[in-house]
Amino acid sequence: MRAVFGIDVSKTSSEVAILVNGEKVHGYTILNDTIGFNRLLGDLKTVHNPEIIFEATGVYSRRLQAFLEEYSYAYTRLNPLEAKKQLDSLRVRKTDKIDAEKLAKSQLVHNRKPTYVQEEVYQHLRDLSRFYQNMTEDLVRTKNRLHKVLQVTFPELENLLSTPTGEQYWNLVMAFPCKEFVLSLSQSNLCEIIRQSTSKRISEKRIAYLTDKLIKLAKQSFCAVKKTSPMLEEVRYYAQELLRLSERRQVVLNDMVEKSRNCK
């Protein structure tokens, strides 16, 4: 007896079609949760060596995949393009939907092998890579927002360091969102803030140079808002968020490197 389970996964639910020796014997819809998956599990247990096929739908099919792996069921996961090409021959009309029954019938035709399940560490690496990419995109967006708001409050500050980015720059932006915060402090206080703005070693000569340059830029600047403007808090917020994102992204990168070493 050959039993094929075709599963059409969507956002919150999945359509299940069960074919035995080529004939559909059952079909139903389950929620993508423990209750729904347990109903599917009950049917899987009634047959020997069930063939399970579904289309990869990103994060939506991830839970079904994890459930099947937890109970040691082999499955065939099709990428969307592969599914479309292989199922076109089973459609009466080109506009017909790829559904669970068609997925199951296609397995009878193509006899696909089960999808190779990699070690968990590889899934972790893919998740970390996606997380890293998302944080990189967040960093770019936040940098652009900081740049725009600084054009109103203290655009000259972007010229203090060689590049307007990184730990020291963002710390200085938080300390000096507009020129008044520079000109209201003594030179010794400014030197101390610059000294504390970086976790790296910085020479006294460099500190003195940056202090003099900062004062010059502040005197040159014309701020379009008052010291009480909420835009100054916005400047600080973006700078603080950039620090947080940068630090967190480095943690993720270190984790990726460590896990990659363990794969070898």
Segments predicted by a language model, with ranges:
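A detector of single, family-specific signature residues
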Residues: M1-K264
